[in-house]
Amino acid sequence: MRKVKPARKLGRTAAHRRATLSSLSTQLILHKRIETTEAKAKETRKVVEKIITKALKGTVHAQREIFKDIRDKEAIKTLFGEVVAKVGDRPGGYTRIIKLCPRFGDAAKMAVIELVDFAEAPVAAPKAAKQDRAKRVKGSKKVTGDVAPAVAPVPSAPAETQEEAKAPESAE
């Protein structure tokens, strides 16, 4: 009887899928954070978690096993040097997936996958203290309390005379 396999096929052949996941894993190790589709991120997480767990052993055999999946020497150096040093005491859960808004072109579900210990919080610029408008606008005066503004009263306009009201406008 046919059984369902738990992995996503990602619309690729087996070799293409393996190459895609290898490439995504390599880039994640090198850059610590990548943006991809949600399905690829979830499959990449499985691969990277296993790779980092093997790397924590630190043996030559582990290096050779990992080199089967990641065929990039720089990524291997980064993995065994930088990554293992930071996640050495963590028992698992080395990656985090953050969902993003859908991609504009095809509305594919997007996500960011990142290594947890390398996630940097965005640095917010310190907000400048809000100044009073009087200090910002040169030469202005701030009105305080119940003081009425210093505005001169406008004299009322003279009312229309009866002659002006009776005279119809002539068409010229």
Swiss-Prot record:
Give the Basic and acidic residues compositional bias ranges. Answer: 163-172
The Gene Ontology terms for molecular function here are:
structural constituent of ribosome
Note the InterPro entries from the entry. Answer: Ribosomal_bL17, Ribosomal_bL17_sf
Alphabetized, the UniProt keywords read: Ribonucleoprotein, Ribosomal protein
A cellular component annotation (GO) from this entry? cytosolic large ribosomal subunit
One of the GO BP terms on file: translation
Report biased composition (Low complexity) as residue ranges. 147-159
Can you tell which superkingdom this protein's organism belongs to? Bacteria
Where is the segment annotated Disordered?
Answer: 127-172
Subunit structure, interactors included: Part of the 50S ribosomal subunit. Contacts protein L32.
Q: Which NCBIfam families match?
A: L17 (TIGR00059)
Write out the similarity annotation.
Answer: Belongs to the bacterial ribosomal protein bL17 family.
Annotated protein name in UniProt: Large ribosomal subunit protein bL17
Q: Which organism is it from?
A: Chlorobium luteolum (strain DSM 273 / BCRC 81028 / 2530)
Lineage, please?
Answer: Bacteria, Pseudomonadati, Chlorobiota, Chlorobiia, Chlorobiales
